[in-house]
Amino acid sequence: MKRKHLYDYVDLEGLHLKEIPDSIAMYACHGTYDIQTNKITSLKNAPSFVKGNFICDDNLLGLGTGLKYGPEEVQGTYNCSGNKLVSLDGIATLIGPRLTMDSNRLTSLKGLPASILNNNKSLSFNENRISSLEGYGFESVEFFEFFFSNNNVTLLRGGPNIVRTSYDCTSNPITSFEGGPTHVGRNFYAMGLKNLKSLKGLPSIIEGSLFISLMDMLRIFPDYTKNDRDIVMSTIRDICHVGGRIMID
């Protein structure tokens, strides 16, 4: 039978566990609950409520029952990265300031909890197989951070219009920045865009730095050479206010 509450930090990181032991089953954890870097395939015996962070990254949940049986409410960060997940079924309904689900096998964000669609939240789903940002309501939210590098996204349409800190669309097959954010409060990462054909839609305001690839710029501006970085930067500043540096790699 589950204990009702545990007022402590649960740290089971890196213990080679295949399951969460019955001996520590609980209803609520009033600290952080950390089971990262194990071989766990099921969240059975996890608490229903976590007041701190819920950290279950680098396990094998996608090969078992996924996020089912996990917490229903996490007031801190929810991190389920590196689990071979193919769906978000069973994810917590209420999540605090940040949801991180990098390095999985997600082709859709169906099931994304409505609680993450509130202003000033952070969402990261780098290294998945997402092909579209449309249909999730992102455009009506002012995210704190929005990261989706190394996916299959072809259009930025459907994503947030305003991001308060950083936005990362690196290594996606987009052809332009149309439909993307108009205002980025910190850094805009847009490197390794091998299909990029135009700077159209680049945010009108980037308060931090812009990170782009030299090869992408030379494709867009074929008359320039690798020695024309200053000209490329000047051209970009003519169409976009960049408060920090333009980093051309």
Task: Locate predicted features.
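Concave beta-strand-loop units of leucine-rich repeat
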Residues: 12-16, 29-40, 49-62, 74-85, ...
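N-terminal capping/linker segments that flank leucine-rich repeat
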Residues: 1-24, 224-249
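Canonical leucine-rich repeat
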Residues: 20, 43-46, 63-70, 88, ...
